[in-house]
C-alpha cells in the first residue's frame, strides 16, 4: 500500500538571521504525535532511520504487563489496546490539516513491526518503509527531488488522512546518545499533557502539542536514564526531549530521549508513624535516552 505523505525532517541548526524571534527552529513545533486508544492517550514522535519511519513512544503508552493465569503480572507485555489512532501536524504551525493513522496493534505485534524494550520504558512501531521513486514516477512529476523517497505502508498501519504539507519526523542524524548529552544545557519537551487544565474551561487546545522548557539536570548511570529539570504530566509520556547546544553564533537542536515519568516528591501528612504519605510532582522527570531507540530498531 502506497502511503501518500511527504516526510519532512525537522531542522537541527539555526543562527543569526534565522528565525531570530524563536529560541529553537519553528518547524519543530509539531514534533510530537498524539496517541489515542480505548484506555486513554499519550505522546510519541516519528523517527526516520535506515530508510524507514517509526513511531517512538514510551512502552507504557503502547503496552501493559500481561496478567498471569494464577494471578500477578508477567515479565512480558501485551498491547494496551487493539487499535491506536495517531494524529500529527506538518512543520507549518498555520497548517490546520492533520496526518491521521490507524494502527492495528495486535497485527503489528504479530509481525514484529512493533517492538518494546524489556528493561527500558520505550517502544517503537514501524509505520512506513522509504523507497526511491522510479524514473517513470519522476518523469510524471517534475516536483519530485533527486533524493526524495516515497513511503510504502506496512501491514496493520493505515494512513486515513494526510496533511497538506507532509509529516514531520526526526532524523537519526539529529540525535545525541547518552554519553554525548551535556548536563546543564537547556532542553525542550513536547507532548500532549491531557491531564492538565479543566476541559470545561477550554483553556487548552488538547488536539495540539504543548512545549515545555527546562534543563538537563543529570544522568543516572545505573539506570542509564536522563534526569530532567522539567515538569511533565500524564499524557506527556512518550514525547520527545530535545537538547539545545550553543555552536558559535548559532545553536543546534537534537533529540536526546523519550519522556518516561515524573519524579514524585513524598510528603507525610500527620505524624511520621501514623501519617499518610502524599506524593506530588517534584518538577523533575525521567527520560529514556536515544541509545535504546537504536537498540530496538537494530534488534
Residue spans of the language-model regions?
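Catalytic histidine site
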Residues: 23-95, 99-104, 128-130, 179, ...
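PDZ/PDZ-like groove recognition
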Residues: 268-299
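Bacterial N-terminal signal peptides
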Residues: 2-10
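Extracellular structured ligand-interaction cores
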Residues: 41-42, 117-122, 211-213, 255
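Sec/Tat signal peptide C-region and signal peptidase I cleavage site
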Residues: 12-17
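Short beta-strand micro-motifs in enzyme catalytic cores
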Residues: 53, 121-123, 226
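Hydrophobic alpha-helical segments and helix pairs
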Residues: 98-166
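Flexible, gly/ser-rich surface segments that form the specificity/activation loops bordering the active-site cleft
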Residues: 18-22, 135, 140-148, 152-238, ...
Amino acid at each position: 500500500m502506497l502511503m501518500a505523505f511527504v516526510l519532512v525532517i525537522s531542522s537541527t541548526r539555526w543562527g543569526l538571521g534565522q528565525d531570530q524571534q524563536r529560541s529553537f527552529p519553528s518547524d519543530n513545533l509539531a514534533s510530537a504525535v498524539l496517541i489515542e486508544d480505548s484506555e486513554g492517550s499519550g505522546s510519541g514522535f516519528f523517527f526516520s532511520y535506515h530508510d524507514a519511519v517509526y513511531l517512538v513512544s514510551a512502552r507504557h503508552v503502547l503496552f501493559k504487563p500481561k496478567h498471569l493465569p494464577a494471578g500477578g503480572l508477567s515479565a512480558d507485555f501485551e498491547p494496551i489496546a487493539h487499535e491506536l489512532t495517531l494524529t500529527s501536524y506538518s512543520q507549518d504551525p498555520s497548517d490546520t490539516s492533520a496526518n491521521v493513522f490507524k494502527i492495528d496493534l495486535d497485527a503489528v505485534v504479530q509481525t514484529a513491526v512493533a517492538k518494546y524494550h524489556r528493561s527500558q520504558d520505550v517502544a517503537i512501531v514501524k509505520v512506513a518503509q522509504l523507497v526511491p521513486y522510479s524514473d517513470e514516477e519522476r518523469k510524471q512529476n517534475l516536483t519530485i527531488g533527486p533524493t526524495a523517497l516515497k513511503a510504502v505502508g506496512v501491514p496493520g498501519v493505515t494512513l486515513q488522512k494526510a496533511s497538506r504539507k507532509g509529516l514531520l519526523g526526526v532524523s537519526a542524524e539529529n540525535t545525541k546518545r547518552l554519553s554525548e548529552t551535556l548536563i546543564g544545557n537547556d532542553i525542550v519537551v513536547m507532548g500532549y499533557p491531557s491531564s492538565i487544565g479543566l476541559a470545561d474551561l477550554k483553556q487548552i487546545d488538547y488536539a495540539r502539542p504543548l512545549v515545555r522548557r527546562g534543563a538537563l539536570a543529570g544522568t543516572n548511570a545505573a539506570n542509564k536514564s536522563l534526569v530532567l529539570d522539567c515538569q511533565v504530566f500524564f499524557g506527556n509520556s512518550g514525547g520527545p526531549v530535545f537538547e539545545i547546544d550553543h555552536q558559535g553564533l548559532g545553536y543546534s537542536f537534537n533529540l536526546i530521549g523519550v519522556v518516561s515519568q515524573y519524579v514524585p516528591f513524598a510528603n507525610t501528612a500527620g505524624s511520621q508513624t501514623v501519617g499518610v504519605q502524599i506524593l506530588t510532582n517534584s518538577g523533575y522527570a525521567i527520560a529514556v535516552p536515544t541509545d535504546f531507540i537504536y537498540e530496538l530498531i537494530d534488534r
